[in-house]
């Protein structure tokens, strides 16, 4: 029965190992339960409690889909980077409502389902040069780290120089710096659940500093009625919607591909041809989770690279994912603990996760300037203009223009020409 439901193979693992692996993965990725409400509550009409519940529910739905459909040992939850794009670019930067952004996420999920069913996913993936794929991940990492420093008050607005160092002796900045040191030590020592432990320890330190409020430990789950199925179709045909949907789709797709390839390679569960088994089913689980997540009020749900920690513990089947989902279900009743966490305590995690996401930068061929210049533009523009999508658009435009002018036509796919023209028109007319 377990084999049929989860792809469980008793010759490769045990039920106990699978559940321990699930608990390990949950501990390493559960920081999203603190970070997501902290981010989304900055938008009017999105209460922290409701966002906490929707985040946990999205993780439960996605991870259960991965367990029963994908039969893989991966955890899913609203993605870091994707949530930053939702809040800071679409809503705060472009000025759209969170309802507009949720609609974009919903459309992206539907498109992802169609692409998975029709196998067009590979064509889109192959259309983007690898240097830009790596640059996008690195740029998002830099952007997330910048947001963390800003939320902590370490980096502040300056009318003369745009930004400057904040008052680092203030309570918030000081707590964030202490938390960064603690979390950094835990990461260096490879402590399982180091990010979550770092958040909780920093939160505890914030109590005598007057920065952490105590709400209790256990409560019934918060209602999501304020954010449930709040889709907005007014601007669904606008070019901005196209750009936002494309960005969500692009990041989600490569997040999932990168995680599946990396973790499956580490787990040695590739087939004889070096391909991921049941990859189509894993993508379908991701797409379903994103679509459902938009309906319950959260950003794009994606596969977490932290799943590698559970794989290292011995997780090999969907039973590990089932255990992760059970942990998220239990966490619904511990919202007071997560909602008491101040922004200064989540800021260190944003910085550390930013570091993790910067790792693809080493794969960019910096000696090949036709590749590295557009890649650098992609990376640097995201934090500089406070927009993930603008970083992607400017990187793609510069890649096409530079290589066309240098007669490197073979490097440019037809899809890249089309995208570059559309993006240029966006900047001209919108």
Give residue ranges: language-model regions.
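Helix-loop-helix hairpins and the membrane-proximal interhelical loops
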Residues: 1-50, 163-165, 197-280, 421-425
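Helix-loop-helix junctions within the multi-pass membrane cores of secondary transporters/permeases
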Residues: 2-36, 58, 78-88, 92-140, ...
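Residue-level signature of catalytic and energy-coupling elements of molecular machines
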Residues: 19, 39, 124, 193, ...
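Helix-coil boundary and interhelical linker segments in multi-pass alpha-helical membrane proteins
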Residues: 38-50, 89-100, 239-242, 340-342, ...
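Loop-to-helix transition at the N-terminal end of transmembrane alpha-helices
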Residues: 44-64
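Transmembrane alpha-helix interface/packing and boundary motifs in multi-pass membrane proteins
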Residues: 62-75, 184-190, 248-255, 286-296, ...
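Membrane-embedded alpha-helical modules
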Residues: 94-208, 212, 322-430
